[in-house]
Amino acid sequence: MDEKELKQILATKAPAYQRSLIEIPKDSFVTWHSSLTDYLDSVLGDSPKMQNRIDHLVMRYRLGATDEVKGEHYGTVLPRINRNGMIVGGNVIHFNVDDGSILNHDALVNHLYSWYAFDYYVDPNVFFGEHLLYGRLAVVVQEEKTALLGTLAYPDIEWLAVGVGNNLTDEMMKKLIGRQIVLYPDDFCVDFWSEHFGGKFKVDDSFTHCDINQYLIDFIHSRQVP
């Protein structure tokens, strides 16, 4: 073992306040199909056009898969990527392929000790989908799955997700000032989003008592989105 390898291993043992911030390499995550893409296939159909759109979604969001199987399906790697193209966090989620519910959820960084022998750079104030943010019109939702369905249903709107298990922060919303933004909270975060961000941004509570994911799926089918 050389000095560099020893330093990398020791870095994973250091207290959090002593760790250096090192970028997770872009080529460390290979896009692949998983329980989430299997779910999308099951609810949206397997027509060639839809399959191509889902494949394109996998590449744009750099969705990956773990080799850990639950319910006969691979876990989904949902990386958060900043505007510089750096992977700065994310989630690893196993989805129920039949209904899209979450079977198991874990933060991406919790897997890094077993995947890498070096420390990592994490920024909790980055949206899922932020690396694709270029226009002025954007929607903010809680779950990554919702943002992906929204992109398929309304491709002209940029969809951002806070991420399962994460909270919307002032730092995240500061980056959206000057854009046309609509926040669609679920029933768990509607009070906080409305009270904390309602003064500067539009908060629409239309989906606090109905399933936004099912709405998007129905919209795709009804409009026959290609």
Task: Locate predicted features.
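Phosphate-handling DNA/RNA-contact segment within nucleic-acid enzymes
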Residues: E68-I177
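Serine/threonine-rich low-complexity intrinsically disordered regions
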Residues: D2, A14, S20, P25, ...
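TOPRIM fold recognition
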Residues: G135-R136, T146-P226
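Sequence-level detector for tyrosine residue identity
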Residues: Y17, Y39, Y61, Y74, ...
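Generic hydrophobic/packing signal
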Residues: V30, L36-T37, L44-D46, R53-R60, ...
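TOPRIM metal-binding catalytic domain and adjacent DNA-binding surface shared by DnaG-type primases
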Residues: M1-N84, L132, I220-P226
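Extended hydrophobic/Leu-rich segments
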Residues: L6-L10, M50, I54-L57, I102-L112, ...
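A generic structural micro-environment signature
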Residues: T12, A16, V30, D98-D99, ...
